[in-house]
């Protein structure tokens, strides 16, 4: 119900902020979890800028949870809420592989289970939606190396990945796998009054309303997969071209709150690449739509990233049929980001609001 209170984690991130905007536009009241007062001030400033002219302030509040892995961390935040959308992922700064099992895997599991336990204790929550990833469903081999004999779907589950992890991406994947497996086991064992929905986006692309400068868009995020090519970077490490628009990700999360959507299931969010599609296709899109910016060197448009496993395929029919939409194609995803890049100043000349205090 659109007048219900939703607890949202991760609202200060690329995906979470877009979900916050969508919730408010659809009439929900939102209690956003922040980690510090400084984050709250920054979030409210960006919300004011994006939602200007919209009457939302009486439907938005923040609550501080400094440490997501503390027992009962979300209990107070979840009081009197009808839904929880858990988007936040562990914040990892260590480059020491010995830390990654804790930082990626244990923290991810603790956060998800903590949210579920808070939902149970609240006595009011009807559904929890957790943001996972395509890497929570499929092995690295299935995504990066093996053509799909049949399209991969959201019903897939894989065993947990144990350390050591060769690089951070594998540790991140281990966290996503452990999180979904643990959360589903918790639901099966606890049999709470609420249900659970997992969302599994591929590489998320699209306008980032948290960005205020071009410099912000050059920082690493999933948008960087395409923008690095537009900005002339040559990356020797390839990836499968599996992408989705941030608008579609937000839409799925919010529509999943509808009680008409059956709970205790997963949804894969990804557009279907056309045969022969490559990451470098972005160059022809940009040349066609922004020729002056290319000619002037604002968009070098001469980068490269290899496309691997062109034979991988996803079955997203359940997602599109349940939520009643067609995924935004890769071309539109990329052009939205490039258009925003050209609209923004190079650097922020105004007063900076701390995002770390």
Swiss-Prot record:
NADP(+) binds at residue 172. InterPro entries: Epimerase_deHydtase, NAD(P)-bd_dom_sf, NAD(P)_dehydrat-like. Keywords: NADP, Oxidoreductase. One of its GO terms (molecular function) is oxidoreductase activity, acting on the CH-OH group of donors, NAD or NADP as acceptor. Its EC number is 1.-.-.-. Pathway: Mycotoxin biosynthesis. Ketoreductase; part of the gene cluster that mediates the biosynthesis of cercosporin, a light-activated, non-host-selective toxin. The perylenequinone chromophore of cercosporin absorbs light energy to attain an electronically-activated triplet state and produces active oxygen species such as the hydroxyl radical, superoxide, hydrogen peroxide or singlet oxygen upon reaction with oxygen molecules. These reactive oxygen species cause damage to various cellular components including lipids, proteins and nucleic acids. It is an enzyme of class 1 (oxidoreductase). This is Ketoreductase CTB6. Disulfide bonds: none annotated. The keyword Cytoplasm does not apply. Belongs to the NAD(P)-dependent epimerase/dehydratase family. Dihydroflavonol-4-reductase subfamily.
């Amino acid at each position: 119900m659109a007048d219900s209170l939703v607890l949202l984690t991760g609202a200060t991130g690329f995906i979470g902020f877009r979900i916050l905007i969508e919730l408010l536009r659809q009439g929900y009241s939102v209690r956003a979890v922040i980690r510090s007062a400084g984050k709250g001030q920054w979030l409210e400033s960006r919300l004011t800028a994006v939602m200007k002219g919209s009457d939302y302030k009486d439907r938005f509040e923040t609550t501080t949870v400094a440490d997501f892995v503390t027992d009962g961390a979300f209990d107070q935040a979840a009081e009197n809420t009808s839904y929880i959308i858990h988007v936040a992922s562990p914040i990892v700064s260590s480059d020491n592989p010995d830390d990654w099992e804790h930082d990626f895997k244990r923290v991810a599991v603790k956060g998800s289970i903590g949210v579920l336990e808070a939902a149970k204790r609240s006595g009011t929550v009807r559904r929890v939606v957790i943001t996972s990833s395509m890497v929570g469903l499929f092995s690295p081999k299935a995504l990066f190396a093996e053509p799909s004999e049949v399209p991969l779907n959201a019903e897939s589950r894989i065993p947990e990945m144990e350390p050591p992890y060769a690089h951070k991406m594998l540790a991140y994947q281990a966290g996503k796998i452990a999180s979904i497996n643990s959360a589903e086991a918790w639901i099966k064992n606890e049999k709470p009054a609420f249900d659970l929905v997992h969302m599994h986006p591929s590489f998320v692309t699209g306008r980032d309303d948290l960005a205020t400068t071009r410099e912000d868009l050059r920082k690493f995020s999933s948008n960087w997969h395409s923008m690095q090519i537009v900005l002339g970077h040559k990356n020797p490490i390839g990836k499968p071209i599996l992408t989705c628009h941030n608008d579609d990700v937000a839409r799925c999360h919010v529509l999943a709150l509808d009680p008409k959507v059956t709970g205790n299931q997963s949804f894969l969010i990804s557009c279907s690449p056309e045969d022969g599609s490559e990451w470098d296709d972005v160059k022809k899109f940009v040349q066609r739509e922004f020729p002056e910016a290319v000619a002037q060197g604002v968009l070098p448009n001469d980068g490269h990233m290899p496309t691997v496993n062109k034979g991988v395929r996803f079955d997203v029919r359940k997602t599109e049929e349940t939520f009643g939409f067609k995924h935004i194609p890769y071309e539109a995803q990329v052009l939205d980001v490039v258009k925003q890049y050209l609209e923004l100043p190079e650097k922020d000349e105004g007063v900076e609001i701390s995002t770390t205090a």
